[in-house]
């Protein structure tokens, strides 16, 4: 969250929330 809009979903999917 707050790192890269759009990529946040990818990180969240992999279990990593940036």
Swiss-Prot record:
It comes from the Eukaryota. The keyword Secreted applies. GO terms for biological process: antimicrobial humoral immune response mediated by antimicrobial peptide; defense response to fungus; defense response to Gram-negative bacterium; defense response to Gram-positive bacterium; killing of cells of another organism. It comes from Acutisoma longipes (Neotropical harvestman). The keyword rRNA-binding does not apply. Keywords: Antibiotic, Antimicrobial, Fungicide, Membrane, Secreted, Target cell membrane, Target membrane. This is Longipin. Induction: Constitutively expressed. GO terms for cellular component: extracellular region; membrane; other organism cell membrane. It is found in: Secreted; Target cell membrane. Has antifungal activity against yeasts like C.albicans MDM8 (MIC=15-30 uM), C.albicans IOC 4558 (MIC=7.5-15 uM), C.tropicalis IOC 4560 (MIC=3.8-7.5 uM) and C.guilliermondii IOC 4557 (MIC=3.8-7.5 uM) but not against filamentous fungi like A.niger, C.herbarum ATCC26362 or P.farinosus IBC251. Has weak activity against the Gram-positive bacterium M.luteus A270 (MIC=60-120 uM) and against Gram-negative bacteria P.aeruginosa ATCC27853 (MIC=60-120 uM) and S.marcescens ATCC4112 (MIC=60-120 uM).
């Amino acid at each position: 969250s707050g790192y890269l809009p759009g990529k946040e979903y990818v990180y969240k999917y992999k279990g990593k929330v940036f």
